């Protein structure tokens, strides 16, 4: 559209064209973000992640504490983490982890119905791989947009990494309390031993904490934790670890 005033001609861009421009910019930004995630994950097939989105957020808040505090985190190889802890987490968080494709459709549908009944997001039906996707790149915010991005990153993780590597990164990056990340830091923080020495009962209690690590950190030794740990301990023997284990 061209508007004419006297001898001056002014080009006016139509609203439709602005919408097309904005859509193109948004699409380009979205694709660039997905490419960034994809490349990062591909690199992690042979390089360990330095930190996660959750760690960086916590580090900022901890630095403003009085006195300032730091993240507790120490990467250890997969074979230096107790099999008890691996089995406890799979028994608690994702029983079909070794064989699923990163998604549990039944759990997702159940979470959808629960959220619809509550009128807000209260459950996510997340597998271990989905939890890792969220921890690595996203925030604690609960929204359907974030959930959609989580599902895309989950596909990338399952496509680019094998199950053992996914589990190794998860074990080294999952939160176990305010500022406590990874199996090694958790084992030393709660039991003053390395992750390789965690027993079955200790592992079961740590697995219970994963959905609400900060709450359990502040309410250690609760009756619920003990009851839930007993259930997990009974299931650990049937937990299937990734094939190479």
From Swiss-Prot:
Membrane topology: Single-pass membrane protein
Superkingdom of the organism of origin: Bacteria
Known EC number: 2.4.99.28
InterPro entries (alphabetical): Glyco_trans_51 (IPR001264), Lysozyme-like_dom_sf (IPR023346), PBP_transglycosylase (IPR036950), Pep_trsgly (IPR011812)
UniProt signal peptide: none
UniProt key word Membrane: yes
HAMAP family: PGT_MtgA
Protein function: Peptidoglycan polymerase that catalyzes glycan chain elongation from lipid-linked precursors.
Name under which the protein is recorded: Biosynthetic peptidoglycan transglycosylase
Organism, scientific name: Burkholderia multivorans (strain ATCC 17616 / 249)
Protein encoded by which gene: mtgA
């Amino acid at each position: 559209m061209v508007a004419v005033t006297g001898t001056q001609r002014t080009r006016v861009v139509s609203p439709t064209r602005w919408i097309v421009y904005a859509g193109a910019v948004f699409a380009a930004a979205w694709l660039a973000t997905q490419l960034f995630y994809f490349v990062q994950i591909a690199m992690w097939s042979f390089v360990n992640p330095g930190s996660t989105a959750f760690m960086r957020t916590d580090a900022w808040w901890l630095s403003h504490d009085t006195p300032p505090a730091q993240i507790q985190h120490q990467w250890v190889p997969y074979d230096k983490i107790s099999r008890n802890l691996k089995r406890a987490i799979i028994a608690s968080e994702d029983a079909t982890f070794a064989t699923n494709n990163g998604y549990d459709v039944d759990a997702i549908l159940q979470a959808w119905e629960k959220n619809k009944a509550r009128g807000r997001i209260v459950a996510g039906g997340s597998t271990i791989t989905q939890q890792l996707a969220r921890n690595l790149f996203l925030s604690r915010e609960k929204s359907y947009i974030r959930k959609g991005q989580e599902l895309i990153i989950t596909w990338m993780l399952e496509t680019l990494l094998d199950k053992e590597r996914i589990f190794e990164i998860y074990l080294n990056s999952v939160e176990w309390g305010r500022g406590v990340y990874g199996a090694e830091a958790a084992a030393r923080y709660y039991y003053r031993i390395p992750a390789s020495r965690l027993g079955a009962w200790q592992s079961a209690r740590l697995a219970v904490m994963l959905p609400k690590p900060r709450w359990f950190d502040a309410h250690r030794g609760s009756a619920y934790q003990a009851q839930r740990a007993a259930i997990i301990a009974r299931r650990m023997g049937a937990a299937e670890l990734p094939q190479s284990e």
